[in-house]
Amino acid sequence: MPQICKQKISNTQNCDREEYKDGFCIIHHNGKDKPNNIFRKIIRDDIYRGFYNFSYMISYDGFSLEELKIEKDAEMIFRNSNFAGPFQIKNRDLTASFDFTDANFDSGLFITLSDIKKEIIIKNSNISMDLNFSLSNFDSLITYNTKINCKANFSNTCINGKFEFNHIYFKDNLNFLNAVFRDDFTFQNIIVEKDADFRNVVFFKKMKFENVEFKGNFKPAEIIDNDKIELKNVLINGKLIENNQKAKEDKKN
């Protein structure tokens, strides 16, 4: 019978994986004799048996959903997970949600050329090396209290549901070139240390920036003249916009 894992791997303390030499299960063992791509192999086995909760797991080799069959309406949970290698989803059509609460991505988070038809949540997390969500369709993207210590690319991506970024720190460039937002876009309590590119962005409902500081060059500069976009306490290209909706609000009153 397999031993109980000494680390909590998912929503249960009973780990069905055998205990390894150092007393930990194979996924947490970090010795030189650790098999290559063990994290991906275990992920593959778990998905085949309908297990989608990968919380508290440690990946030394990264993670990819390549060639894995995911059931419809699956909830992919990666809470408190750590990825030393890149996390990659490429060219996939998935009716699945992803929860990256309290996760760390040391070598990048990549979801490209994909259609994700349920919600993606990134909360209390850290992303380094690269963040690339380009050339994709997402149902909704909710990100809260997260440090993005790298370039962030959302170019040529369509968000069909809500897009909410709150309390986010961008250490490098931010790219939304040619992005499409079919529902509300909310960008609050944000610092962008370098350049931001919002050229050719299309939005269908509300687009709101509040308590945002763009320290680098912002494109297009003409955004400050568009009163259909809400700007409240926003620093853009060295100019502070306290409230570009004030005239409209005064008329209503």
Predicted region positions:
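N-terminal leader/targeting and pre-domain segments
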Residues: M1-N253
